[in-house]
Amino acid sequence: NWHTACFPQKSVPRKDPATGPIALLARDSSYLEKVSSAFYSAFSLEVIPNYFNGSEIPLCLGSTPISPKDMPVPQINDFMYETLSSYPLAHHQGDGMRSFLGIVLIIYANQYTSMFIDEPESFLHPPQAKLMGSLIASNETSGRQLFISTHSKELLNGMLESGPDRIQVVRITRANDVNDFALLDVDDISKITSNTLLKYSDLINSLFHERTVLCESDSDCMFYQLIWDTVRASEPTPLFLPVGGKGRFKTYVDLLSKLHIDYSVVADADILRNPTDIKSVLLQDNVV
């Protein structure tokens, strides 16, 4: 359970199997280094197991203490205990720190071949959610299958940057007690990550909106969103997404269609000059 993974755990003799991630930290220095490095990237604090505490091992946060040279072993134990006892404890921190550390402890432990993580972005600020996504999709989790439910575009963007060749995105919507599933497979993901305009657009955010309105430019998006907010303020606001010119509508339309996302195309009148442009996006009443 990643919600409680960072809570103190019983000290386990080395001859016995490790019963949890904190016990594993005591035996695997590379595992500790990965966990501490990931946490430091998010919060600028190292993770230090306090093996000197007694029967329970809590996780401390701060800089790893270094004992003075030539200090006898008994004094080293006292020094480390006193120093670490003054450090903040991981399980006393807020929900964001605890959840981040708990997930990192679980995914880096390499104890499970399949994992289900529900909304790992919970309690995290957007930059930390993006970092969490990159950690989840990194090579450190290769060889395992992770099922992630999320409502965070930041988490998804982090995953796309870190491991685009490992990701499939399933969009689930529900209407009239019927679930609808739409899939972006590895090839579709590659189209996004290999195209600079798509990669750095807000396309992923379409997953979390009922409708996306495609416009040619940022100024068009702002203009039409202003009209929407004025005329239809009581209705859910669609995502207004600039595509960078009428010749790029088709790329966005293809991906939105595959994800079963309702969309509208708002183009300038000069799109009518080129039959190819208009045919590429014309679908029932989706073009204005």
List the predicted regions and their residue ranges:
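Extended helical coiled-coil dimerization/tether regions that scaffold
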Residues: W2-F100, L105-S114, P126, P275
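Active-site-proximal structural scaffolding
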Residues: L32, G96, H125, I148-S149, ...
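A generic structural signal for well-ordered alpha-helical segments
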Residues: F39-Y40, N139, L256
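Residue-level detector of anion-binding/catalytic polar loops
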Residues: E46, Q145, D262
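Switch/communication elements of ASCE P-loop NTPase nucleotide-binding domains
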Residues: S67-N205, M222
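Acidic, divalent-metal-binding catalytic cores of TOPRIM
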Residues: N157, I172-V288
